[in-house]
Amino acid sequence: MFRLSQYMRELLHPTPLTAPRKPAGPVVIWNLIRRCNLTCKHCYTTSADINFPGELSTPEIYAVMDDLKAFKVPVLILSGGEPLLHPDIFAISQRARDMGFYVALSSNGTLINPSNIKQIAAIDYQYIGVSLDGIGQTHDTFRQKQGSFEASLAGIRLCREHDIKAGVRFTLTQDNAHDFEGLLQLMDDEDIDKFYLSHLNYGGRGNKNRKDDAEFQLTRKVMDSLFEKSLSWEQQGLHREVVTGNNDADAVYFLHWVKRRFPERAEHIRTKLEQWGGNASGVNVANIDNLGNVHPDTFWWHYGLGNVRKRPFSEIWMDVNDPLMAGLKASPRPLKGRCGECYYQNICNGNTRVRAQQMTGDFWAEDPGCYLLDEEVFA
């Protein structure tokens, strides 16, 4: 995850360089339930509006939470499917808050409504992310349900009315890139706190729809626009949070943008980006699915590391006998091709390994989703 707005602030208000701090434990994205009221084209969990057998019970979830707390996991992102369909979502969320976790909810927003907004507000989630993949019909087509855009937007508005930090998550593909500028305008019109741009990753239905992955020139155009919008928001003092995910080449592309626009700040930004270190799958980001299987991140559902019913998460996470985990935790990673030769490995860290694995069968092959030109990779 590349926190673009953080580095925009560094451009305008540089802070002293400090020693990098290693997070105590990984951020855990937890798919509590696979059931969902939508069937989105790019869903990595391939969810549907049916019950999936074998999911962790609430007592099992609590036991895992105890282990995560002892392992110093700082953040729980509760996801699905649609997490609001879990019968005990509020009890689980409240327990997580009481234990001191930073707790976020990853929702499609359609089930946030007047009947439950007070319960949601009472939990005091630190953040609620709502997926919007375009304006109006574009979103409805991606979500495969008419009216879902208006329902999701209504959920965001309810969150804003109840002082809950809410944000938009947008997955970029060729089929919805035309609505990107409209979503940025929506951020202004609705005074939304956060914008998260997710590049299409090759997992679940996203793997089946990778032919819709935005072409590289389109991706570059979108990123250029996002850089300028984020800069404008910072210059206006709006301080909206802007984050991108699933393509750590964004950080390198941003550095080249800084070299052109703010050359006097380029070395400072480069050092800050190196301290961040790029892709954190298997290191500072983890996933637990609805069945209790542990994965390096949410797009590795086809590759399990172990199950929390059989071994504690803390034990699974530190086991480097698994070849994928050994490589993800290695520094540098055993990258090949362009990624192995890239001048900016210490910023990107090999980008998203699941795309390489899905396309070539090799964990460590070059990432086919890297949109950088050769002259941007090797200089």
Language model segments and positions:
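Short, acidic, Ser/Thr-enriched surface-loop or helix-capping motifs
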Residues: I288-D289
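Cysteine-cluster motifs in flexible loop/terminal segments that predominantly coordinate metals
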Residues: R333-V377
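Radical SAM/AdoMet-radical enzyme domain recognition
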Residues: T58-E215
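N-terminal pre-core extensions flanking Radical SAM catalytic domains
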Residues: M1-N51, D66-K69, F313
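Short, basic/aromatic recognition patches
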Residues: H268-G277
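C-terminal accessory region of radical SAM enzymes
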Residues: Q217-H268, N293-Y343, C348-N349
